[in-house]
C-alpha cells in the first residue's frame, strides 16, 4: 500500500507545483480572449500530467526512504538483516533482476517495493513484519515485492497515472473556466480569467485527482493478484504466500476475518474503491484456485 499511496501523494503535489509554476511563468497559453483553446489545453494537460507522473517516479525511492525512515542495509548488523539481504538476492536472481537495495524501517507489519526502474529499485520491510511472521512467510512477502519489480508495476503505474493526470487537468480547467464565466460580470469584456478561475482550477484539480485515484487503485488491485502469483512461482509453492496473507490479517489457517485493515487490505463497501489491495479472502482464493 505504501508504494501506491506515496506515489499518488507525490504525484498530486508535483502536479500542483507544476500547474502553479506554469501560471507564474505564463506558459499556460490555452486561455485566449475568445475563450479556451482546446488544442493548446490538451497539450498543456498532457505535458503537466505526464511530467508530474514521471517526476514522481524518479522521486519514488527517495520519497519512500524519507517518509518511512527506512535504512538501507549496506552492511548487515545482525543475522536477520543478513538473511533479508541474502533472501532478496536469491529471489532477484530467480526473477532475472539486478539486486535491489534492501531497507528496513520501524513500523506495523508491512513491506513495499519501489523505484524508477527494474535496475534501480528498493525493497523495504518493516520491523513489525519481521517480528510477526516466520521466515518462510517473510520470504513469501519478499517474493511478492520482487514480483512487483519483475512485472514493472511502477513504470506501468506511471503511464496510467500520466493519462489520468491529463484528464484531471483538462477537466479541471474546463470546470474552472465555466465557474469563472458564471461569476464574471456581464460588463466585463476583458476576456481575462478572474481570481475565481485560479482558485477553482486548483480546487477542481485536487477534487478530480482524488476521484481519479479510483482508476489507479483499480489497476493496483489487479497487479496485486499478479504479484501474488509471481511470488508463488518464485517460491516454487503457493502455501507460503497463502500463509503470509493469513498472517497479515491475523488469521488462523482456514479462517477468514470479517474486517481487514492490515497492509491496505480492503473489505467491502465504497471504501474498497480507494484501496490499493483486493480483499484478503479474494487473494487467498485466487492462489488456492490457481492451477
Swiss-Prot record:
Primary localisation category: membrane
Cofactor: Zn(2+)
Broad EC category: hydrolase
Positions annotated to bind Zn(2+): 144, 148, 224
Catalytic residues (positions): 145
Location(s), subcellular: Cell inner membrane
Protein name, as recorded: Protease HtpX homolog
